[in-house]
A protein has these predicted regions:
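Short, flexible segments with low predicted structural confidence
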Residues: 12-13, 26-30, 137-139
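Short amphipathic alpha-helical surface micro-motifs
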Residues: 6, 14-15, 24, 69-70, ...
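A short, structured beta-strand/loop element
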Residues: 20-25, 29, 34
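N-terminal leader segment of winged-helix/HTH proteins
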Residues: 1-18, 88-89
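Long, charge-rich, low-complexity alpha-helical segments
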Residues: 32-228
Length: 228
């Protein structure tokens, strides 16, 4: 079995009355304050999809580079973020299955201005020693989208959709213009919920391009995910 992890929500910094900026993750309209170590772990997964081993390695590296006192264990912060719904995981027999179980129930949120996010990512890579200063230009450049990715961005910009809803609607060639269309076209049975939709979909080769396009948009920092 393979387990994949990612972070959900959007990072914002809010100033206190004393003028200090504190990190907040906004997920489905709720604000969550993060400790320094929680932010460190959450940022390891922002726009990344990692196995547990990869995540622990990334977190350990950033802890080594971090100044000041060390916190509690990696597992402690992973559990805290998971309980608060800011880190999610998906388990499957194959990479595709695990990826779908990871993303299926998450709502796709298109990002308008992605330059600050790309810059933040470059700074992280630079501090980790992954890239040099001369490589900033290449990493800051916005990657072109494929036709499939453009279609997904346009649809997600019009209607709030989960990955499972998007995969199902595109597979069945449903025309979605608004929220009502989602309910009418995809939730045709009284017992159908967004979670049963995730559970009922059996990923096969015709759906791979859609799932891959969604993952690429996320890794290229053009979308983020929120929980329902």
């Amino acid at each position: 079995m393979l387990t994949l992890y990612t972070a959900v929500g959007t990072l914002k910094f809010q100033k206190t009355t004393g003028g200090k900026s504190i990190p907040l993750v906004i997920n489905d309209g709720q604000k969550y304050g993060l400790s320094d170590d929680e932010l460190l772990l959450w940022s390891c997964l922002a726009f990344q999809i990692l196995t547990l081993h990869e995540l622990q390695d990334a977190y350990t590296l950033r802890q080594i580079q971090k100044e000041g006192p060390k916190g509690l264990s990696f597992q402690h912060y992973l559990n805290r973020l998971s309980l608060r719904g800011l880190v999610v995981s998906g388990i499957g027999l194959t990479g595709v299955d695990a990826l779908y179980r990871l993303l299926g129930s998450l709502t796709i949120i298109p990002l308008k201005d992605t330059f600050p996010i790309r810059l933040f990512g470059c700074v992280q890579l630079y501090l980790e020693g992954t890239i040099g200063a001369k490589e900033f230009g290449r990493y800051l450049k916005k990657k072109p989208s494929s036709p499939m990715e453009d279609t997904i961005l346009k649809l997600a910009d019009k209607v709030s959709l989960t990955t499972a809803e998007l995969v199902t609607s595109m597979e069945q060639e449903k025309v979605i213009h608004n929220e009502s269309d989602i309910m009418d076209e995809l939730y045709t049975e009284p017992e159908t919920t967004y979670q049963t939709l995730v559970d009922d979909v059996q990923i096969h080769h015709t759906q791979y391009p859609v799932l891959q396009a969604i993952a690429n948009l996320y890794l290229n920092k053009q979308i983020t995910f929120h929980t329902c």
